[in-house]
Amino acid sequence: MLLGRIMLPLLLVLAACLPDHSSGRKEGAHMVSDKPVRVGLVLSHFGLGDQSFNDMQYNGLIEAYRRFDIHTVFRVPRSEADTDMRPVFDELIHREQCNVLIAGEGFQMGPLVYELAKKYPDVYFIVFEYKAGVLPNVINAEFAQNEGSYVAGFLAARFSVTKKIAFMGGVDIAVIKDFEAGFRQGMQRGEPSCQLVTEFVSRLPDYSGFYDPKKGYEMASRLYKEGADIIYAVAGGTGNGVIQAAREAGKYVIGVDSNQDHMAPGQVLTSMMKRLDVAVLRLIEMRIAGTLRGGVYRFDYKNGGVSLTEMEYTKKMFSEPLLRELRTLEKQMADGVITVINTLKG
């Protein structure tokens, strides 16, 4: 296994603040029963510096370390193969003695998490957006990406000049389709005449669509040439290529997961943030308090689990009436006034 390779200067600084306390209990460490809380995070093999899913979770871990002074450690497997992921989890359980494990990539780590949870009932496993039954020590963290996408779709439809907007999904899995459904519904509210073109970078069982910025760039360049003036890129690291294409074409993109507005100031209209950092911090805090139980925890507009950015570089591009509408829409979303399609609801 590999320690996370940090690709951004900021993350280099943050990593220096996250020592590996493998020698045992720290003075003043927070306790659960008679054991100190020890948290291990397994990121996807793409590692740190993705400006997306991995970085958000890592930031939450950093904040938990700073606030609670607990043992924290992260690892990055060489690949998504079971033969590479399993030893990482084993190391965190046995050598690091972690009693809270966060699986940073639910759709690929989920099956292994459920297997290990049955074997180690005293370890709490947090997995994002993957559910295969109910276990007392498995925490399923879900996000209302449909709600955030609805608001993003409304904004895109009101801002688009060509009235042709594209949705680029990394892989055709259920959670990505939930993004698309909310985005489409929001577009319809914003401007019913808008056309939405939906494409996926890869299809199951191929997950490379989340880690292929070159293909994202090529697809986005084509979509812009075909008349789309905004692309909602829900594709992990592949979205970095979409942002590059927007920059070169003079078009617009909506980022996802983390705040990507700075990656092309003035052309990333906003980012629909799934606050994995908030989720990681809150769930660790609950474990420290002894209130964490197995089950589903949903992070939505109401509790700060999803939101648009402050649009630092683009707010001046929107009219004041549109910004007022957007603020009203966000309040309605938080208050539960708006019902958004949820394609994941069983």
Task: Write out the residue ranges for each language-model feature.
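A residue-level marker of the well-folded mature domains of exported/periplasmic proteins
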Residues: 18, 25-346
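Intrinsically disordered and other compositionally biased segments
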Residues: 9-10, 282
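Intrinsically disordered, low-complexity regions enriched in serine, threonine, proline
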Residues: 2, 22-23
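Hydrophobic h-region of N-terminal signal peptides that target proteins for export
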Residues: 11-18
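Sec-dependent signal peptide recognition
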Residues: 2-9
